[in-house]
């Protein structure tokens, strides 16, 4: 198998003017739009899409062609389980190439994605499953036992689960206003509440163009879980603009030393991190010498940095 094609990008950010951006920017929302087509299928097959590192140290390079084929295979599997346009697909998986492909597969079917972190407690997951009533729950062997004999159909996947499935799939032609994603609130004032987002919602995330200044082929890393907007949008947004996603599959919770080591070894240039993660990493006194970085841009959100 040929190796995915890497691209180099300049280290210095472009000079962006807020006033000029406001003057020149125009919202462009086509009538027909699908996240999977815009984020995944438009890229050249040979181009590098993701570098995934497991906490064991294993590293995988994944091309766009591999993600395109894998998402089509998953779409065929979901279709065989009765998933149709407008249905909901729940996903409880760690951040892996297979997980991203399952996201795209869901959107190619015209279904709604409900992604939940493997770090969620059982009660939180049960509430979301009960409230969303998904057609299928997708998980892995490490988490399957958490769901027992739940009424929802369960699909357990791994790296080899769709080897013999066809990679040909005709994606549904969706409207930009068709529902695509179901996010849940944090539940600070009662039970978490579901909020439906249409396919067009990703077009609103222009921060990756104007704040992160994403350049084609740039090494990007987002630290958020792929279960909330601040985790999934930093996956999809940079990909739309041609970045290479560097994904770290943690063992358990956030470890600032392991995170800084990952960023340093892979020479990540563009990062989205929560204020909590930034404070945790800054608490390491000798971080600059132990973990030299190549950051071009680091962005954060959610609360003030201090």
Task: Please name every model-derived segment.
Residues 203-222, 227-269, 279, 283-284:
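Conserved AMP-binding/adenylation subdomain of ANL enzymes
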Residues 60-65, 180-204:
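Conserved AMP-binding A3 loop
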Residues 94, 139-147, 250-252, 268-306:
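Adenylate-forming
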Residues 50-104, 121-126, 200:
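Conserved AMP-binding/adenylate-forming core of the ANL superfamily
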Residues 80, 101-165, 169-172:
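Structural core segment of the AMP-binding/adenylate-forming
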């Amino acid at each position: 198998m040929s190796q995915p094609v890497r691209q180099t990008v300049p280290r210095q950010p472009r000079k962006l003017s807020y006033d000029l951006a406001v003057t020149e920017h125009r919202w462009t929302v086509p009538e027909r739009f699908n996240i999977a087509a815009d984020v995944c299928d438009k890229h050249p097959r040979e181009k590098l899409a993701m570098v995934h590192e497991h906490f064991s140290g294993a590293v995988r390079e994944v091309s766009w062609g591999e993600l395109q084929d894998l998402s089509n295979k998953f779409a065929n599997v979901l279709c065989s389980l009765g998933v149709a346009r407008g249905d909901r697909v729940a996903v409880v998986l760690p951040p892996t190439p297979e997980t991203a492909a399952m996201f795209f597969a869901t959107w190619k079917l015209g279904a709604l994605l409900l992604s939940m972190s493997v770090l969620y407690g059982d009660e939180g997951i049960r509430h979301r499953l009960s409230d969303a009533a998904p057609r299928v729950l997708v998980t892995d062997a490490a988490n399957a036992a958490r769901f027992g004999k739940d009424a929802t159909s369960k699909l357990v996947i791994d790296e080899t689960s769709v080897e013999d499935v066809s990679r040909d799939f005709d994606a549904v032609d969706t409207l930009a206003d068709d529902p695509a994603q179901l996010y849940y609130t944090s539940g600070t004032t009662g039970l978490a509440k579901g909020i439906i987002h249409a396919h067009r919602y990703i077009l609103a995330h222009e921060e990756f163009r104007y704040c992160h200044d994403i350049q084609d082929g740039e090494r990007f890393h987002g630290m958020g879980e792929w279960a909330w907007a601040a985790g999934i949008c930093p996956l999809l947004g940079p990909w739309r603009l041609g970045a290479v996603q560097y994904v770290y599959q943690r063992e358990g919770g956030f470890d600032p030393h392991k995170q800084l080591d990952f960023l340093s070894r892979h020479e990540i240039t563009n990062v989205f991190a929560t204020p909590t993660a930034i404070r945790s990493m800054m608490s390491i006194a000798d971080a600059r010498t132990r973990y030299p970085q190549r950051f071009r841009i680091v962005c954060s959100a959610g609360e003030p940095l201090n």
